[in-house]
């Protein structure tokens, strides 16, 4: 979903969000500068800011030196762009930071401080990808081990029956 020019309401605190233009990426990012400090990224915008080498000076300037109000992260949140209920997902396989994602339009909402925390999880995208690969390998490896163990526990008579039955 392309960035709209409409003013959005923060899904965490309901305050009107401010559009901050980030010239380096050529996009507007919606930031709750007068409420909780949350940031809403339209579909695919987040990928422009999630690594350490990507410039977020304009975002930092918009949120620095503010005393943001606390929010209840357990309450359901609705996408400020399309109104769909947002889902909580972990930002990485480390499962340390949860972000709110909209499956309808692809938007992402980060609570105050989460963008910096996500950027500090990995040095670069390659490190993130390697971590995902290790996680998947470990998960599949465990499943394969369980399958092999279950196969070994089958009695010879059961194996014969399975073979005759085409299982």
Spans of model-derived segments:
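Short, recurring structural edge motifs at helix starts
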Residues: 17-21, 25-31, 87-91, 97-99
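General detector of N-terminal leader/presequence modules that precede the first folded domain
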Residues: 2-12, 16
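Cys/His-rich metal-chelating microdomains
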Residues: 16, 35-39, 85, 105-108
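Short metal-coordination and nucleic-acid-contact micro-motifs, chiefly zinc-binding Cys/His arrays
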Residues: 4-6, 25-28, 72-75, 98
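Short, intrinsically disordered terminal segments enriched in charged and Pro/Gly residues
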Residues: 45-69, 122-161, 167
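Short, structured motif recognition centered on aromatic/hydrophobic residues
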Residues: 39-41, 46, 108-110, 115
């Amino acid at each position: 979903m392309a960035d709209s020019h409409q003013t959005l309401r923060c899904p965490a605190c309901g305050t009107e969000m401010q559009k901050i233009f980030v010239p380096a990426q050529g996009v507007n990012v919606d930031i709750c500068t007068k409420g909780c400090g949350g940031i809403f990224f339209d579909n695919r915008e987040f990928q422009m800011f999630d690594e350490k080498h990507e410039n977020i000076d304009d975002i930092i300037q918009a949120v620095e030196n503010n005393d943001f109000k606390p929010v209840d992260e357990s309450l359901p949140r609705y996408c400020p762009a399309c109104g769909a209920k947002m889902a909580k997902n972990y930002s990485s396989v480390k499962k340390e930071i949860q972000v709110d994602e909209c499956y309808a339009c692809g938007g992402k909402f980060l609570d105050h401080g989460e963008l910096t925390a996500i950027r500090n999880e990995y040095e670069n995208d390659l490190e993130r990808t390697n971590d995902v690969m290790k996680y998947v390998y470990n998960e599949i490896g465990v499943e394969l081990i369980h399958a092999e163990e279950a196969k070994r526990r089958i009695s010879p008579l059961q194996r014969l029956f399975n073979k005759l039955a085409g299982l």
